[in-house]
UniProtKB/Swiss-Prot annotation:
One annotated Gene Ontology cellular component of this protein: cytosolic large ribosomal subunit
Function in brief: This is one of the proteins that bind and probably mediate the attachment of the 5S RNA into the large ribosomal subunit, where it forms part of the central protuberance.
The organism of origin for this protein: Thermotoga maritima (strain ATCC 43589 / DSM 3109 / JCM 10099 / NBRC 100826 / MSB8)
GO BP term (any one): translation
Record protein name field: Large ribosomal subunit protein uL18
Amino acid sequence: MIKKESKKEQRLRRHRRVRKKVFGTPERPRLCVFRSNKHIYAQIIDDTIGHTLVSASTLDPELREKLQKTWNVEAAKEVGLLIGKRALEKGIKKVVFDRGGYKYHGRVKALADGAREAGLEF
C-alpha cells in the first residue's frame, strides 16, 4: 500500500535538499525562517561555528505591543524589518536566504521583503 507523505514531511525533505547547498559563512551568514500557525521566527546563523548571531520573532516584546495578529503577512514584514535592523546593528549587511522548505510566497516573502527594506542584501 502506498502512503501519501504529509505536507510537513514534504517540507522537511525540501529543506534538507536545500540545506545541502545553502551554507552560512562569517561573511554571509544564513537568514533562516521558521513558520508556525501562530508565529513566524527568523534567525541569522553562522554555520561554520553553529551560532545564532541575531534572532527575531512575533514573540519579541517590542513586536507584541505593536501587532494585533501574529500570524499574518503584516506581522511577518515587521519581523523582517526587526531582524534587518538588529543585523545592521551587529554589522551584518549580506546574508544567504534560507526559506526553510516553504514556498517563497505570503509570510515568507513578506519577511524577506521587510529584511531587504531594512537594508539586508540577499
